[in-house]
Each structure stands twice: as C-alpha cells, then as structure tokens.
Amino acid sequence: LHAPHDSGAYHRSRRTVSALMKQGAQVLIDVHRDSAPAQAYRTEINGQQVARVKLVVGRRNPNSSANLGYAKKVKAFLDQNYPGLAKGIFVGRGVYNQDLRPTSILLEVGSNQTTLGEAKAAVGLFANTLPEITGINPETGARQVSQTADEGSNWRSLGWLIAAVIIGGAGYLLIST
C-alpha cells in the first residue's frame, strides 16, 4: 500500500493512519512480511497450511508499554484460539507509528518465502479474532464487555480496522511477491 518500502514508508503511512483515526479507528495494525526461511513461519491450523504471525512492538515511543500489553493480550487470544499461529512478540527499536495509539501493533505475516495463500490464510484467521479481542459483537455492533476507550469504541472502528488490515495486508503481500 505504501510502496516502496524504504526509510520514508512510515512517513507516508502516517498520513493514512491519521486519516483512519479521524474516522474512528481505535486499533492500528501495520501488516508486513518478514525476511526469513519459509519453515520459520509455516504451520498447520485446522488442516490448512498457513503462515505464522509475529507481533512487533516499538520501544521508542510513549505508548510502548501500552502497546506491549495490547500485543500480549492479542497473542494470548491467538494462542487460545489458533495454537501455533502466533510466532511470538518482538520488541524492536523503532517507533512504527505506534506513538499514535496505545493499541498499535506491527504484524509480520509470514516471510518473503511463504506463499501468498499462506499469508492470506493467516490474515483471515487473525481477522476472525478481532471482534472478540476488541470486545465488539460482529452481528450487533455492540460491545460484549465493558472496556476503556483505548480498547475500542464501536462497530465502525472495527470495520475500518478490518478493512485496513485486509487492504494493507493484501497490498503489501502483492507488492512483496
């Protein structure tokens, strides 16, 4: 979506993120692919070969503690519902635009060696978990549990989040293959 992937990519994507936040997005997920051997990122879930995902949190921003807590919540939920999908949490040196929201993560979906189909399958599984992680019922749009404003506000936010993950992920996956 924000090609080329160079030192200016986060500056360019920041405009998109800011626009999504103005429309009500409460959770930010930046989708990438890692550079690693396929076997490091390949697993089988429910009989289907999928790419594994790694959650990345930047430590050089004021939201790093909150983002790490959010990443731990997401990983725990993935581990419970799709064992083996989450490769782990990596705390990196960057900011990754995570200074914009305390519910931000960078998601490495497979590697440049896993297939586009495996990556799409992983994004689909991850997207399936978003309603429960954010506490929003996908059928009614209502909150399922009491939450703070930082954890999600409404169905529209979830819709924008899912759209951003799918569009950004698909765009990046197409560019990187």
Label each residue range with its predicted role:
Residues 1-40:
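Catalytic-core regions of hydrolytic enzymes
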Residues 2-11, 16-18, 56-65, 108-118:
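Second-shell loop/turn segments in exported
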Residues 12-19, 66-73, 77, 118-121, ...:
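Extracytoplasmic/secreted proteins, especially bacterial periplasmic and envelope-associated proteins
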Residues 21-26, 59-66, 131-145:
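Generic structural signal for short, solvent-exposed loop/turn connectors between secondary structure elements
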Residues 26-108, 112-113:
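Membrane-proximal low-complexity regions enriched in glycine and acidic/polar residues
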Residues 88-144:
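Active-site-adjacent mobile loop/cap segments within catalytic or ligand-binding domains
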Residues 145-166:
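Juxtamembrane/start-of-transmembrane alpha-helix segments at the extracytoplasmic/lumenal side
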Residues 166-177:
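C-terminal membrane-anchoring or membrane-association module
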